[in-house]
Swiss-Prot record:
Entry keyword set: ATP-binding, GTP-binding, Nucleotide-binding
An annotated Gene Ontology molecular function: ATP binding
Positions contributing to ATP binding: G9, M10, S11, G12, A13, G14, K15, S16
Protein name: Nucleotide-binding protein Athe_0320
Species, as recorded: Caldicellulosiruptor bescii (strain ATCC BAA-1888 / DSM 6725 / KCTC 15123 / Z-1320)
NCBIfam families in the record: PRK05416.1 (NF003828)
InterPro entries associated with the record: P-loop_NTPase (IPR027417), RapZ-like (IPR005337), RapZ-like_N (IPR053930), RapZ_C (IPR053931)
Coiled coil: none
Phylogenetic lineage: Bacteria, Bacillati, Bacillota, Bacillota incertae sedis, Caldicellulosiruptorales
């Protein structure tokens, strides 16, 4: 059966890197495809003598007015029961601005409004808001290096396919550095007593045994973890049955170094003990400690 991956998302979030990664994975790749051509591409691929089994196409706002029909095309593909996945790449506004300044490229919507990069990014985000809701996979590239993005795509579209299982990612983060854009579920653990205020623990992380012991010794932590484990283990099979291919669970504390790290590690162990494959990412663990 023909497999189609449609790549979209914010300009500057890494779509060009992504399409090159798909080419390396053996996909037939098309960049800047008007959405109206998607159903036709699927028909042509099925009719070719040299069988094309996997297609990756970038569809984004460079298509101008043609892009306005993207949502209708996605609905048509779903209605026709086409085997496609929608990948949405995102990044925080300040990261996108920095990338544009470094490359000195113009944003596709820079001709609208006052011409500022920020306004163009905000307009694009509004245009893509509905499209993002259709995404099977959302990746926040704000903190990813090109090789990290390539590895993540390989994990989703090659390794995961062989396992036929949901890709589960647990992320710890600090609220002071912003919410992760690609999280499906966010849990706030700032109610747990903070090791930061213990002099001997301040400069350690939630991976250190002393910090783990401190975080896990409280009754409120024990009760929360049991409720969290029950909820997540209930949700995973139900999400999988619904066809969800990716689940990103974010655990947040103030700075992302102590409580969230410990809780994320405990959650990973519990899910893995049920036979699921889990990856973990401590987004802010290397950030400077400032309280």
């Amino acid at each position: 059966m023909l497999e189609i991956v449609i790549i979209t998302g914010m300009s500057g979030a890494g779509k060009s890197l992504a399409i090159r990664a798909f080419e390396d994975m053996g996909f037939f790749c098309i960049d800047n495809l008007p959405p109206q051509f998607l159903p036709k591409i699927a028909e042509l691929a099925s009719a070719t003598k040299e069988k094309i089994s996997r297609i990756a196409a970038v569809v984004d706002i460079r298509g101008g007015e043609l892009f306005d029909d993207f949502k209708d095309v996605l609905q048509e593909l779903k209605k026709d029961d086409r085997n496609f996945k929608l990948l949405f790449l995102d990044a925080h506004d300040e990261v996108l601005i920095k990338r544009y300044k470094e490359t000195r490229r113009k944003h596709p919507l820079s001709h609208e409004g006052d011409g500022s990069i920020l306004e163009a990014i905000q307009k694009e985000r509004e245009k893509l808001e509905d499209i993002k809701r259709y995404a099977d996979f959302v990746i926040d590239t704000s903190t990813l290096l090109p090789k990290d993005l390539k590895e993540k795509l390989f994990e989703i579209f090659v390794q995961q396919k062989s396992k036929e299982a949901m890709l589960i990612t647990i992320m710890s983060f600090g609220f002071k550095y912003g919410l992760p854009l690609d999280a499906d579920l966010v849990f706030d653990v700032r109610f747990i007593p903070n090791p930061f205020y213990v002099d001997t623990l301040k400069y350690k992380t939630g991976k250190d045994p002393e910090v783990k012991e401190y975080v896990l010794k409280w009754d409120v932590t024990k009760e929360f973890l049991q409720k969290l484990f029950d909820l997540i283990l209930f949700l995973i099979p139900n999400y999988a049955e619904e066809g969800k291919g990716q689940l990103v669970i974010a655990i947040g504390c103030t700075g992302g170094k102590h409580r969230s790290v410990t809780v994320a590690e405990e959650l990973k162990k519990t899910i893995e003990n049920q036979g699921y494959k889990v990856s973990i990412f401590h987004r802010d663990i290397e950030k400077d400690i400032k309280g």
